[in-house]
Amino acid sequence: SITTLTKNKTFEDIFDKNSEAEIDHISLSRRADLIIVLPTTANFMTKLSIGKAEDLATTVLLASNKDILLVPAMNVRMWLHKATQRNLKILQDYGYHFIGPEKGEMACGEYGEGKMSSPRQIYSYLKNYFDQKNLVKKKILKL
């Protein structure tokens, strides 16, 4: 499991019965200096754009005052849909950061914009992001 491999606790639910002393989604939202959602689906973008907090990931993001990086990945038609583009604008206006999506071949066999950015592009973005900041005692939370 991820817990075994990383030797860190993993979180799955909004409320963990074993850690009732603190509210996990609030404490998690405070731990990281940058939160990355990878991949970010059209559905997830919709939840964030309307402030729907129904699971651990959405509650962490809505409770956070940290930088949030979204890495969209979806079918080209989903990406270009007016609702998705409206949600993109709303999230950009809220201050969310985006990498991609890129043009390329999709898992479904179609070609176009919607492919998740490559690990190299994401690494380059993160390196640039953190090169501009003092990294002493900083943490990154991946959702």
Task: Describe the residue ranges of each PLM region.
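Cofactor-binding loop segments of dinucleotide-utilizing enzymes, especially the Rossmann-like FAD-
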Residues: A73
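A cross-family phosphate/adenosyl-ligand binding-site feature
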Residues: S1-I68, V76-L141
